[in-house]
Design a protein with these regions (language model features):
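Thiamine diphosphate
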Residues: 2-114
């Protein structure tokens, strides 16, 4: 470059940094869902198998969505696909999720509110 020129005056050709990949739409694309139902669906899609949580007013719609999901998807033995384990307090839920993740190698999910 010459003195007084900048890169915008003479841009270099850009090389592609990533390839675009066509992905099929999600099986539930277009279905009307609440925010709480979306949270549960994302957890399911990510392979979450257990949730640890302590209920409070702000998180109740999400808990209701977990219960609805479990009712709709129980296995033949009647087991819930994503059990919700409720400890004595919020701190316990966090410790349980962390311990579960370390012991199992799976994602530990803690859902609490203040």
């Amino acid at each position: 470059m010459k003195l007084g020129e900048n890169r915008l005056d003479n841009p270099e050709p850009m090389t592609p940094r990533a390839q675009t990949v066509e992905t099929p739409p999600h099986p539930l694309a277009g279905k009307r869902m609440t925010g709480a139902e979306m949270i549960v669906q994302v957890l399911v899609d990510e392979g979450v198998q257990t949730i640890f949580g302590y209920s409070g007013g702000a998180i109740l719609p999400t808990y209701d969505a977990v219960f609805r999901y479990n009712d709709e998807h129980r296995d033949e033995a009647g087991n819930a696909p994503i059990p919700l384990i409720v400890p004595a307090n919020e701190q316990g839920a966090g410790f349980m999720a962390a311990g579960y993740a370390r012991a199992s190698g799976r994602v530990g999910v803690c859902m609490v509110t203040s």
